[in-house]
């Protein structure tokens, strides 16, 4: 079970083991879902409608976008920005899961609330994600820039990107989109953790005979369901974040269609509504849901898997 478990037979992992499990979970998950992330970002940054009926639209579907990216940029394009993305995932996973475990334990020991309640998991999950976001946000901006650029490349290496961005846009560039990121990540991560816990309880209630026979499958399915629910409810804020993160990077976006500048979160929301309609808030939702189902499912699956491995190692060591 993710989060502090007061039961005597609960996992007894150290904080270091929790951080390692979170890091490895992030690393493996990122490698598997990177292509969906690249397609999602391309959709989010395209101002034209995602439709064949719009002659100016570069992308209009997942398969079409996949073929076009493959033809124009080669298979490595699906892992553009993968190094900063992996740094992001490893750091984010460690901070998020460690913070969540510590916060739920703090709630259990210092309040009257049960650490396993939906509301506790929602608040602790949201706060843990905010802590992780503040830690790794500069890397997220770098990842978005790498994934968003076409050919010819503006940034050749990670060091080149850091130097160019700092000289041309100043240090504040590394925290572009932070406000909508924090606003979006709190409910998104809160829903991930709380829905995951609730879906696991529902699964055990619906299929009590299963017990622990298919626990790994249960973790994967419940994680995927939690990912779809949380992503659907918070998607517009993710779109605003991506649009704001590429501000000042318009020259590299010219090959993808229209280019717009935004003054801030509210201006971005207003322009999207006026020029792209209400459906503009959900551009790229289909690859995002696919990505959310896979990434959240794998995230919880691998985290629980490695925590269980460490728990078994600790138990074996204590019995010697």
Swiss-Prot record:
Keyword terms, alphabetized: Antiport, Membrane, Mitochondrion, Phosphoprotein, Repeat, Transmembrane, Transmembrane helix, Transport
MF terms in GO: antiporter activity; thiamine pyrophosphate transmembrane transporter activity
Substrate recognition (motif): residue ranges: 241-246
Reactions mediated catalytically: thiamine phosphate(out) + thiamine diphosphate(in) = thiamine phosphate(in) + thiamine diphosphate(out)
Solcar repeats: 13-106, 116-202, 214-309
GO cellular component: mitochondrial inner membrane; mitochondrion
Cellular compartments annotated: Mitochondrion membrane
Pfam families assigned: Mito_carr
GO BP: thiamine diphosphate biosynthetic process; thiamine pyrophosphate transmembrane transport
Membrane topology annotation: Multi-pass membrane protein
Positions where Phosphoserine occurs in the chain: 51
Transmembrane segments: 19-39, 87-107, 122-142, 173-193, 220-240, 293-313
InterPro entries, alphabetized: Mit_carrier (IPR002067), Mitochondrial_sb/sol_carrier (IPR018108), Mt_carrier_dom_sf (IPR023395)
Protein family: Belongs to the mitochondrial carrier (TC 2.A.29) family.
Function: Mitochondrial transporter mediating uptake of thiamine diphosphate into mitochondria. It is not clear if the antiporter activity is affected by the membrane potential or by the proton electrochemical gradient.
Listed name of the protein: Mitochondrial thiamine pyrophosphate carrier
């Amino acid at each position: 079970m993710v989060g502090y478990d007061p039961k005597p037979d609960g996992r007894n992992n150290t904080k270091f083991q929790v951080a390692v499990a979170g890091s490895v979970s992030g690393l493996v998950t990122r490698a598997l879902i990177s292509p969906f992330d690249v397609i999602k970002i391309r959709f989010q940054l395209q101002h034209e409608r995602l439709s064949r009926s719009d002659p100016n639209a570069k992308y209009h579907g997942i398969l079409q976008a996949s073929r076009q990216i493959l033809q124009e940029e080669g298979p490595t394009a699906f892992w553009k920005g993968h190094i900063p993305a992996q740094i992001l995932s490893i750091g984010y996973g460690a901070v998020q899961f460690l913070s969540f475990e510590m916060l739920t334990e703090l709630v259990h020991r210092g309040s009257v609330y049960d650490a396993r309640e939906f509301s506790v998991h929602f608040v602790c999950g949201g706060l843990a994600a905010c802590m992780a976001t503040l830690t790794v946000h500069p890397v997220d901006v770098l990842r978005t820039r790498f994934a968003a650029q076409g050919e010819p490349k503006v940034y050749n290496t990670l060091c080149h990107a850091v130097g160019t961005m700092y000289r041309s846009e100043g240090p504040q560039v590394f925290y572009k989109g932070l406000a909508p990121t924090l606003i979006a990540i709190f409910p998104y991560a809160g829903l991930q953790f709380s829905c995951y816990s609730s879906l696991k309880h529902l699964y055990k209630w619906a299929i009590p005979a299963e017990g622990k026979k298919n626990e790994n499958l249960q973790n994967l399915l419940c994680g995927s369901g939690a990912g779809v629910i949380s992503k659907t409810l918070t998607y517009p804020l993710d779109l605003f974040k991506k649009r704001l993160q590429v501000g000042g990077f318009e020259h590299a976006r010219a090959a993808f269609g229209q280019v717009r500048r935004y003054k801030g979160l509210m201006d971005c929301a207003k322009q999207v509504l006026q020029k792209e309609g209400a459906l503009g808030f959900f551009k790229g939702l289909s690859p995002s849901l696919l990505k959310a189902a896979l990434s959240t499912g794998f995230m919880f699956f691998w985290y629980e898997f490695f925590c269980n491995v460490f728990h078994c190692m600790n138990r074996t060591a204590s019995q010697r």
